[in-house]
Amino acid sequence: MKIAVIQGPNLNMLGVREQQIYGSMKLEQIHAQMRDFAAQSGLEIEFFQSNLEGEIVDKIQECYGDVNGIIINAAAYTHTSIAIRDAISAVNLPTVEVHISNINRREEFRKQNMIAPVCTSSIVGFGPFGYHLAMVGMIQILNEIKAVQEMQKQQAPQAE
């Protein structure tokens, strides 16, 4: 199983920006923890970060046919990007949205979430540990999909 982790704008500044909200852990440290868990779980994982909406859309589209699932923190684009929402919907892959802070307890404009309705699940407010939870959740989602597909194969009429 292969998972793409897509990080949105300003996440490259983790550990520097607003530590009272996002903590002191750098993005590279989060990715190192995810890489370790992926290795223990037999997952292939790739990472992508961009501050540019179009590059994020391109990366989501590149995931089609290449990965089994997406973990995304669209950051500020969560609240504004119909393009990212449409890209997630278009590729139709299991997608888990992650936010380090609890966006529902922050500024009013952050309560608008454009992408959650097209994601399989959302994990918010657990700090960097949310990425670990997203990976555990993604493994569960992918295993359930695999089990359903295997059951459907067994139930399909045998060709004569």
Swiss-Prot record:
Provenance organism: Sulfurimonas denitrificans (strain ATCC 33889 / DSM 1251)
Cysteines engaged in disulfide bonds, as pairs: none
Database matches in PANTHER family: CATABOLIC 3-DEHYDROQUINASE
Record-stated family: Belongs to the type-II 3-dehydroquinase family.
Alphabetized Pfam families for the sequence: DHquinase_II
Protein name, UniProt field: 3-dehydroquinate dehydratase
GO biological process, one term: chorismate biosynthetic process
Gene name of the encoded protein: aroQ
Keyword DNA-binding among UniProt keywords: no
Enzyme class: lyase
